[in-house]
Amino acid sequence: MSIDWQNLYQERRATAKQFGEIWDLPIESRYHRVVAKHGGKGFSVLEVGAGDRSFEIKLQDYWGEVTYRSCDIDPTYTHDFGHIDEVTGEYDLICAFELIEHLTLIDAQRMVVRMHSLLKPGGIAILTTPNVYYPPAFLRDATHITPLCYDELGGLLRLAGFELRAMYRLYHDSVFKKIIRRYLMYPVFRTIGIDFARQIIVVAEKPVT
């Protein structure tokens, strides 16, 4: 698979036009609170890069009974699938948290295309990635490979056939730090082109038709 760079650039611009600048993105405190808005009882869910599978418990707390499947190349925990290419079935929701930045850009595109193919029509994909406007979030981990700006991630998803439904900055901190970073220091951050939010979360839908 190769990337059509001109089309990716156009989809990036379309994403920026839809959501504005990084500082225009609304703030949510936790990724699972975003997820909770986009599912319900009986949903079939695939988590890619599932780690210890603890996300399943959060889903059950929110929605009750769900069909949860996990995929991870790390054999530390037992998973339903060892690679996204091995995944079978169709899903209402596919999630990948803090995963895509560990891939090359080509592999990232392969992953979102594969996610699109595994979703039911009208199904939802939710991804998070470090916010490149908050440099420590990406730079502090040597296993991070590809920094993805919010419009770049949106462009990849649009290029794969998704429609973007929502995009947020994720930020949770003490009240004192929130006051300092979100209000007192905000003009300085914006002037020098950085942000206080550590992650970006994107909600994308596979069109019904």
Regions found by a protein language model. Name each.
Residues 137-156:
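Acceptor-substrate binding/catalytic loop of class I
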Residues 159-166:
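Substrate-binding/catalytic lobe of Class I Rossmann-like enzymes that use SAM or dcSAM, i.e.
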Residues 122-129:
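Conserved beta-strand signature within the Rossmann-like core of class I S-adenosyl-L-methionine
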Residues 77, 134-139:
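A short acidic, helix-capping loop that chelates divalent metal ions and anchors anionic groups
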Residues 97-102:
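Short catalytic micro-motifs in class I SAM-dependent methyltransferases
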Residues 1-95, 106-113, 118, 151, ...:
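Conserved N-terminal segment of class I S-adenosyl-L-methionine
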Residues 51, 130-135, 147, 170-174:
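Short "lid" loop at the C-terminus of a central beta-strand within the Rossmann-like core
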